[in-house]
């Protein structure tokens, strides 16, 4: 994204990249792997990295507030679920995560809650399956829920899922 903005799109507008702690270092490492020598390149636009604080509203630019919550996935990935508020609307996303006690706060009153449901029946570490989603459906409290991150097993039975 940053490399394309610099080289392909010739971006001039400022860019903000917000994420868990170490986002800037991880982005720079990834860019260097994708394009060796990119560490010496200077974008022709303002590039700002923001390390978001967990369970606190983070102002991103003028119009966006993002509140990240701890997710349950491999610790090395700094897993987070996010709640995004802009223009009077709320969109939230579980990210890659098994059920956590924070999910109702992430989803509560959201206009759209994007919820992972990796398997239809099989329990798997670090992910929710469809029984998990159904068990907690009422706790989510979102106006609309869309399921995502389907495994081949889930895709094979997607017609059984009314959502």
Locate the predicted segments by residue:
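Cap/insert and terminal regions of metallo-dependent hydrolase folds
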Residues: 98-163
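Binuclear metal-dependent hydrolase catalytic cores
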Residues: 1-92, 98, 105, 158-163
């Amino acid at each position: 994204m940053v490399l394309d903005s610099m080289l392909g799109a010739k971006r001039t507008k400022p860019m903000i990249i917000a994420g868990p702690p170490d986002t800037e270092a991880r982005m720079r490492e990834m860019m260097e792997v994708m394009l060796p020598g990119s560490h010496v390149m200077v974008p022709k636009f303002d590039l700002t990295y923001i390390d978001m604080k967990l369970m606190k509203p983070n102002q991103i630019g003028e119009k966006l507030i993002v509140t990240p919550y701890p997710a349950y996935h491999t610790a090395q990935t700094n897993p987070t679920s996010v709640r995004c508020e802009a223009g009077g609307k709320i969109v939230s996303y579980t990210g890659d995560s098994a059920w956590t006690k924070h999910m109702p706060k992430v989803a509560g009153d959201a206009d759209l809650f994007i919820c992972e449901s990796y398997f239809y029946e099989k329990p798997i570490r670090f992910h929710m399956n469809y029984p998990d989603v159904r068990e907690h459906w009422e706790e989510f409290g979102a106006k609309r829920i869309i399921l995502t991150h389907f495994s081949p097993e889930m895709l094979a039975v997607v017609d059984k899922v009314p959502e």
